[in-house]
């Protein structure tokens, strides 16, 4: 058996984490031969609820769950951490503007970024799930100057999975028949679900769908799926978000499927003309515990306009919290 690795989960008593922690402990994220130490962070008022979650984890008797830490101290939660899933974030309350939300979360993610910088393993892999995920990841990354910025990612895998599912449903094919789905940009309603490079059973997906359906139904459906779930369920998507987090980390750690790629919010190196340093979703291939942006994809005017629009939104979010970012 391998030596255990430390996995930090923030917002650990929340809805998404309740769908996430048990799957991590069962080996779904890092493999059936990798023991884990779960380091769970919560705000002080939620520690009692977290204790209940830890009791349930105990009661599952997972062979791979080596031990657990429950804490309200970020420095303890990130100590020697190898993987971190930053799920906890300030939800948008009634009457809150987006900029209020950005500022409230900037405070949370700057503290966590500093704790990662000071206490985590130098090779830590960080996935930000809590919204606004791309900008929260940027804030954490900027507060961890001693950690390679490539080690901070934001989750757009839920959008990627939604895009695949909507296409599979339209064409009446299996999810397994679809490859090379791409989400560009922000995890928000400006994201661009791109089918121009996607394949269905090896054939171009874009040739199988009507252009009006693609532009006027498919793209808005994927962009606004989160809001549709809140309307139907009365709560935001939790199990599907947890599932996407598992997929994102699993592929980053263990490798993405051969001949395919995944969508990840990553540190832009200027690829496709996107401003360097933004956390932007690109098509990525993962192997040997690292990711690379897929290069050389042709981008037409339709795609370029949408890729730029979501970049502009991310620049605006960054500028809204600029005063709170380290120089």
Curated annotation (Swiss-Prot):
Reaction catalyzed: (S)-malate + NAD(+) = oxaloacetate + NADH + H(+)
Active site: 187 (proton acceptor)
EC number: 1.1.1.37
GO molecular function, one term: L-malate dehydrogenase (NAD+) activity
Residue numbers binding substrate: 92, 98, 131, 162
Residues the record lists as binding NAD(+): 11-17, 105, 112, 129-131
Record key words, sorted: NAD, Oxidoreductase, Tricarboxylic acid cycle
Enzyme class: oxidoreductase
InterPro entries named in the record: L-lactate/malate_DH (IPR001557), Lactate/malate_DH_C (IPR022383), Lactate/malate_DH_N (IPR001236), Lactate_DH/Glyco_Ohase_4_C (IPR015955), Malate_DH_type2 (IPR010945), NAD(P)-bd_dom_sf (IPR036291)
A GO BP annotation: malate metabolic process
Role of this protein: Catalyzes the reversible oxidation of malate to oxaloacetate.
Family: Belongs to the LDH/MDH superfamily. MDH type 2 family.
Name of protein: Malate dehydrogenase
Organism whose genome encodes this protein: Teredinibacter turnerae (strain ATCC 39867 / T7901)
